[in-house]
Amino acid sequence: MMRQSLQAVLPEISGNKTSLLRKSVCSDLLTLFNSPHSALPSLLVSGMPEWQVHNPSDKHLQSWYCRQLRSALLFHEPRIAALQVNLKEAYCHTLAISLEIMLYHDDEPLTFDLVWDNGGWRSATLENVS
């Protein structure tokens, strides 16, 4: 018996579609962080005041926070292939994180920085995502 094989050529994502994908992921992540009914655990999205009651300089706490946030984001955002979470600042009244993201169908890493500011998360990098 002769076996036939089918080959499918997958279309490459154009630069414009990649840019739209990146912006969409960042926008959705920012919405997830700022949602009052977020699926993420309270400490991960609220930052303050919950962060203040803990010792923000505790390296064990920082490592735990990054692991928990990474796990939750990978669960809730299926377009992310790989993720690294880093704390940029962790002080009593300041919490800044950097997400190093690899998306499916995108060969370039995406950096998304978030800062806890006046009771909500904001992004300094969303406008620059391309």
Swiss-Prot record:
A cellular component term, taken from the record's GO annotations: cytoplasm
Span of the signal peptide: none
GO molecular function per UniProt: anti-sigma factor antagonist activity
Record's subcellular location: Cytoplasm
UniProt key word Kinase: no
Alphabetized UniProt keyword annotations: Cytoplasm, Stress response
GO biological process: cellular response to oxidative stress; DNA damage response
InterPro entries: Anti-adapt_IraD (IPR023776), IraD/Gp25-like (IPR007048)
Superkingdom of the source species: Bacteria
Protein task: Inhibits RpoS proteolysis by regulating RssB activity, thereby increasing the stability of the sigma stress factor RpoS during oxidative stress. Its effect on RpoS stability is due to its interaction with RssB, which probably blocks the interaction of RssB with RpoS, and the consequent delivery of the RssB-RpoS complex to the ClpXP protein degradation pathway.
Subunit structure: Interacts with RssB.
Family: Belongs to the GpW/Gp25 family. IraD subfamily.
Protein name in UniProt: Anti-adapter protein IraD
Organism: Shigella flexneri
Gene expressing this chain: iraD
